[in-house]
């Protein structure tokens, strides 16, 4: 009997338990160190530029509407925070992609209780680098046109008032894609097939992406939550019957 599906927060909570377990802790340390170095550097840079970015994005209002500045300023602060968050998350996941893919493999072994993946070796990890980086570039190709569109929208007066909510929705969707793609890619599921499967599981995907998005906004906590999100996404793949998404692809391959 298959294990029951969970909610987004439950997947993340169970993922955190998994990465803190003795058998998986070792596979978390290296990506955690990479994320820490990147996080410190980005926070240092953003801290020096934050006010300047907010001022550039804020629309210039006539004097009789100047009182609106007090209402709009928090909105544009949120917008800058979201943009910094996106930058950190995308860079961290590109750099740590091979380690995250490998962590996802090991989590799936623990969850399923069977090991269908090759035994660990540094050669195997190195061999994963081209495939995982190519997949990250595919994600970047999906992300950038949409992010650029939202970025341009942020500079259009009046219309830019909806930029922050749109960034939020897009961010939630991207978090689902970013992390659930690790187990999907380990099983060689094509990019378009993976997106189609996530759309079929839209509400479950948005629930998981939403909680991941929320916890990754919390400084320091986000460093540990990134590997927890990888583990939670792998559990999502197993519990939500991700293998079913591979059936059409396997039929095409056989034919």
UniProtKB/Swiss-Prot annotation:
The record describes its membrane topology as: Multi-pass membrane protein
Organism the protein comes from: Pseudomonas fluorescens (strain SBW25)
Keywords of this entry: Amino-acid biosynthesis, Cell inner membrane, Cell membrane, Cysteine biosynthesis, Membrane, Sulfate transport, Transmembrane, Transmembrane helix, Transport
- What cystine pairs are annotated? none
The processes (GO biological process) annotated in the record are: cysteine biosynthetic process; sulfate assimilation
As for subcellular location, the record says: Cell inner membrane
Keyword Membrane annotated: yes
Task: Please tell me where this protein is predominantly located.
Answer: membrane
Annotated InterPro entries: CysZ_sulfate_transptr, Sulfate_CysZ
Protein origin, superkingdom: Bacteria
Which cellular component appears as one GO term in the record?
Answer: plasma membrane
Pfam families reported in the protein's UniProt record: EI24
Membership in a protein family: Belongs to the CysZ family.
Question: What GO molecular function annotation could you give as one example from this UniProt entry?
Answer: high-affinity sulfate:proton symporter activity
Protein name from the UniProt record:
Sulfate transporter CysZ
Role, per record: High affinity, high specificity proton-dependent sulfate transporter, which mediates sulfate uptake. Provides the sulfur source for the cysteine synthesis pathway.
């Amino acid at each position: 009997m298959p294990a029951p599906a969970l909610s987004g927060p439950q997947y993340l909570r169970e993922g955190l338990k998994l990465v803190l377990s003795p058998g998986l802790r070792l596979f978390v340390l290296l990506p955690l160190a990479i994320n820490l170095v990147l996080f410190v550097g980005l926070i240092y840079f953003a801290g020096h530029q934050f006010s300047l970015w907010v001022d550039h994005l804020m629309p210039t209002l006539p004097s009789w509407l100047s009182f609106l500045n007090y209402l709009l300023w928090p909105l544009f602060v949120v917008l800058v925070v979201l943009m910094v968050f996106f930058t950190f998350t995308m860079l961290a996941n590109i750099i740590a992609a091979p380690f995250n893919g490998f962590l996802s493999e090991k989590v799936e072994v623990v969850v399923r209780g069977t090991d269908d993946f090759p035994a660990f070796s540094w050669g195997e990890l190195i061999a994963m680098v081209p495939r995982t980086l190519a997949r990250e570039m595919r994600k970047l190709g999906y992300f950038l046109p949409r992010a650029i569109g939202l970025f341009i929208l942020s500079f259009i007066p009046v219309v830019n008032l909806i930029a922050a909510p749109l960034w939020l929705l897009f961010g939630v969707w991207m978090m689902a894609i970013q992390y659930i793609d690790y187990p999907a890619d380990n099983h060689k599921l094509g990019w378009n097939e993976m997106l189609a499967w996530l759309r079929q599981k839209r509400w479950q995907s948005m629930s998981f992406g939403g909680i991941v998005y929320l916890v990754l906004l919390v400084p320091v906590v986000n460093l540990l939550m990134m590997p927890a999100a990888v583990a939670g996404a792998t559990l999502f793949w197993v519990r939500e019957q991700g293998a079913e998404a591979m059936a059409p692809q396997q039929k095409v391959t056989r034919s």
